[in-house]
Amino acid sequence: MAHPLEGIIREAYAAFGRGDVDGYLKVCTPNFVFNVPGRSAISATYHGKEGVYALAGKAMEITAGTFHEDVEDVLANNRHAVVLARHSFTRDGLAKDYRTAHVYAIQDGRLAECWEQPQDPAVFEDAWGPGL
């Protein structure tokens, strides 16, 4: 039987995919943190609502609005959740595609912190381009 958070997280990702960042944030704690590894153009630690909006804005700017996320699976329990996803977009006229895992810490039934874990860090870095 699926954990109730699995459906809630799927709905949050669907909201994000529609451009409804607040719909995603509804399942996050107020002090939510999203960690993006590496040295790419989006690599940083993003804090709170403003941080998530900054990350989404950066992703849309770099991809000229072509960013697309397919959720392949969601696993969850009362302490952790993992979203397996495939990201695809166009950057500078080139198609980019990679798989990643979003590993979440759960606090009081809400997403408290996320660590992006690309399947292949080199492909991830190439997809997003160099940071400044």
Predicted regions and their residues:
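Short, low-complexity N-terminal intrinsically disordered segments enriched in polar/charged residues
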Residues: 1-30, 130-132
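Short beta-strand segments that buttress and anchor functional surface loops
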Residues: 58, 83-91
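Hydrophobic/aromatic beta-strand elements that line small-molecule binding cavities or substrate pockets
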Residues: 69-74, 86-88, 99-105, 115
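A solvent-exposed, acidic/Ser-Thr-rich amphipathic alpha-helical stretch
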Residues: 22-25, 29-79
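Hydrophobic pocket/interface hotspot
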Residues: 9-12, 24, 28, 32, ...
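A short, polar/proline- and glycine-enriched secondary-structure boundary/capping micro-motif
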Residues: 45, 93-96, 122-128
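Low-complexity, intrinsically disordered terminal/linker segments enriched in charged
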Residues: 113-132
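Short solvent-exposed loop/turn micro-motifs enriched in small/polar/acidic residues
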Residues: 6, 65-67, 95-98
